[in-house]
């Protein structure tokens, strides 16, 4: 079983917590009172590696976390990551300019009420050279406005070049038993080679790898649920992918655990920090208990065989969003 993983000079408890869903993307826009129970449960369980971003809201997600930390006086117990790189308060475009980075860290600090531990560039801007954006991120670190810096959904080539300009501490990208693209595009291998922590978002496949999957058709999603725009969740792809998820559930039954637990434990076994999100305290307890699951070598091989055989159908983002990843 994997209960912690190395991040820089720290040992962080795994899995972490992805806060996006409490105010963004899944048809949720929780008030502080609605969000507080799941954050309290995370704190109680010792799930303290949290992930947010300026664009989740925009600004609302950071503000919710900031209010929680202030109310419960728990800054010293949490590792908080946030992200810039999206003009969230302007036109929503991708921008990595030094001016943007400097301006957005100030807003993040104001909303959180403290400096984040880790600050990412959320999406890579092909119009801004790394020679401008990476020194700007490094300057934040030197100024004490963040301790660590990272990139999100970049290419292996970009990660390598960025790390040659200044030490990159983390790369965040989608990774799960349902989505292993980055094993074949070089990103996982490059991160390992350069000793860069890999933070796996969407470790439950954006909702596929859960018990009691609540959707029978693509029309069942809330009107503002972003999955309505993703090919993987629409048309015939929906039904094909649902059958794949059922196969993983059979594996969980053999292990006498839940599907989310074996999915998260498998990611930890790859040496990656998963950041599953939820709005429900009981689901957070379930997810965090994945750290108690022991995956033996033979079980790891069995799951790997299943992962390699059952490839999902459809792109993982809309056509427009696909243009902003892997750059």
UniProtKB/Swiss-Prot annotation:
Source organism of the structure: Fusarium pseudograminearum (strain CS3096)
Question: What's the name of the protein?
Answer: Aldo-keto reductase FPSE_08125
This protein's source sits in the domain of life called Eukaryota
Active-site residue numbers: 56
Q: Report if keyword Oxidoreductase is assigned.
A: yes
Residues reported in the UniProt entry to bind NADP(+): 51, 152-153, 202-212, 286-294
* Protein function: Aldo-keto reductase; part of the Fusarium detoxification of benzoxazolinone cluster involved in the degradation of benzoxazolinones produced by the host plant. Maize, wheat, and rye produce the 2 benzoxazinone phytoanticipins 2,4-dihy-droxy-7-methoxy-1,4-benzoxazin-3-one (DIMBOA) and 2,4-dihydroxy-1,4-benzoxazin-3-one (DIBOA) that, due to their inherent instability once released, spontaneously degrade to the more stable corresponding benzoxazolinones, 6-methoxy-2-benzoxazolinone (MBOA) and 2-benzoxazolinone (BOA), respectively.
Keywords in alphabetical order, please.
NADP, Oxidoreductase
């Amino acid at each position: 079983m994997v209960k912690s993983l190395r991040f820089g000079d720290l040992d962080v408890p795994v899995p972490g917590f992805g806060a996006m869903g409490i105010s963004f993307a899944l048809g949720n826009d929780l008030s502080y009172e609605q969000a507080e129970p799941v954050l309290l449960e995370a704190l109680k369980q010792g799930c303290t590696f949290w992930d947010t971003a300026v664009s989740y809201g925009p600004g609302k997600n950071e503000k919710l976390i900031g209010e929680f930390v202030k109310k419960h006086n728990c800054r010293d117990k949490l590792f908080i990551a946030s992200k810039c790189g999206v003009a969230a308060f302007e036109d929503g475009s991708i921008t990595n300019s030094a001016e943007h980075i400097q301006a957005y860290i100030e807003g993040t600090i104001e909303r959180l009420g403290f400096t984040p531990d880790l600050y990412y560039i959320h999406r890579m801007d092909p119009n801004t050279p790394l020679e401008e954006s990476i020194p700007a991120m490094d300057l934040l670190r030197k100024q004490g406005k963040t301790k660590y810096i990272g990139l999100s959904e970049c290419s292996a080539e970009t990660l390598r070049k960025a790390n040659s300009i200044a030490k990159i501490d983390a790369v965040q990208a989608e990774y799960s038993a349902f989505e292993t693209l980055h094993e074949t595009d070089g990103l996982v291998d490059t991160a390992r080679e350069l000793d860069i922590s890999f933070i796996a978002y969407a470790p439950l496949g954006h909702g596929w790898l859960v018990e009691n999957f609540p959707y029978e058709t693509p029309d069942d999603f809330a009107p503002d649920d972003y999955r309505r725009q993703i090919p993987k969740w629409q048309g015939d792809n929906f039904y094909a992918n649902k059958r794949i998820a059922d196969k993983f559930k059979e594996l969980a039954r053999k292990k006498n655990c839940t599907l989310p637990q074996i999915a998260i434990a498998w990611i930890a076994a790859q040496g990656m920090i998963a950041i599953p999100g939820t709005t429900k305290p009981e689901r957070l307890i379930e997810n965090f208990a994945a750290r108690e699951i022991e995956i033996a070598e033979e079980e790891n091989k069995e799951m790997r065989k299943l992962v390699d055989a059952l490839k999902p159908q459809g792109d993982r983002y809309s056509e427009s969003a696909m243009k902003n990843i892997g750059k």
